[in-house]
Structures are given as C-alpha cells and as structure tokens.
Amino acid sequence: YKISEEYVLLLHDLGFHFDKIGETGVTDFTRHKHDVFSDRFEFKRLTNEGYQFIYFENLPEEVFEELEEISDEWLNGEKEKCFSVGRFDRGYIETSNVGIARDPQNRIVGFITEQPINKEKASFDLLRFRNDVPNELPTFLKLHLMDELKRQGYCEVYQGMAPLAKVGETSFAFLGERIMNLIYKYGHSIYAFQQVTEEKTVYVDQWRPRYFAYMKDSSFLFSALQLLYLIGRGKNKGVTISEEMIEV
C-alpha cells in the first residue's frame, strides 16, 4: 500500500488490482528561494518565548535517555506500532538524525526524526512530545526540520498522506474509490479527513496520488481488513488505525 504511480502499471501486469487511497503532500524547496518557514506564526511565537531547536547527527547518550522518557510519556502505556512507521528503538534512533526542542527552562520537551529517501528527497518519521507542551510545538519541530533539510541541500520533503483526498471524484472511479469518497466527505466521526488535507496544504507545493494494491483473486474489503489487523496489533496513541492504513 501507499504505492506511487510509477509502480501501478507494473503491479497491474503482475496480477494486482489497485484503488487510490489518497494523495501525499510534497514541499518543493526549488520553489522557495528564500526561507519561508521562519515567517510562520508557530515558529515565531515559540522562538520568542525561548524555545530552541537543536539538530543532532550523533545523539549523546544523555539526550537519548530523555527522548526515551518523552516517548514513554507520549505512548501513555500503549504499544508501539509493529508495521509501517518507525518505532522508538535504540538502534533505529542512533542511526537517525534527530531534532529536539528545549523549552525556556532548557528541558527537552519533544523530538522529530529525519527519514532520508534519497539524496534529493527526505521526510520525517517519529514526532513525539510531552503532554504539557504548547499546541504549536509539533509544527515548530517540523518547520525547523524542514529548514535544516533545505540547508542540507534536499529538494523535496514529503509531508505524509492526506487520506482519501481526491479519491473517487469522477464517475469513472472504481467502486471502492467511490465508497472512499463518501467516507472522505461524510466520515467525520471516523477521522477528520478534510481537516488533515487543509492542514497539510499550508506546506504542500505538489500533491501526488498513492494507491493500495491487492491480488486479483482477493477483494478490496478483505485485503483492507487484513491490513487493518496487521497495523492494529501494535497501535499507539496519536494515530488511528484508519489513518495509519493510508498514512505515509
């Protein structure tokens, strides 16, 4: 799942069916010659209040211990996911570049991990923070990381999925996609699909479609339920199962 257009025809030739499940947002730095992130309200407000962002290529042991404490607080007793996204693991964290946020009292209150895709593209994976932080802190971390990635010479940053965005909007769409379009429009009790799209639009320069592929002899519903079960075995706080199924 989360398959890009370049693989759709290949998988079709291998006997897979596929349905569109949303679009992934991309920030294209080549369109921004000047720094646009420091003008954002969340960036300015927390900076003025004394919050700091520090970027580590090699994480000190004492910092790792604090991040582990933050991660445990964020999980709130729930299990790590066992599929799709990274988990807080020493080996994983030690091989990742990490950005942290310190509050005015110099306490580490949140962190974000960098996820390189290739020499020109990157994304982020873990984004965790303490319970008592300002609402703007996650955005503060993302903006600072994007600023750092731009300085490093990356051209694009993937912002993750807008689940079900632009799915099943035409009369030629597959039945499964048309059903998902109804969920996108009216499924507010399941997940704030349209709100997520609007929030990501702030950073996004391009939207790129993503697909869910399943074997020809299987049904979309059965395959989707299998995927939900696989993800749900390790669900954690902050991301619903329905979001994780269609999230980058």
Task: Go through each PLM region and give its residues.
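Short beta-alpha connecting loops at secondary-structure transitions
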Residues: 181-185
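A conserved beta-strand-loop-helix scaffold within acyl/acetyltransferase catalytic domains
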Residues: 1-19, 23-176, 186-199, 203-204, ...
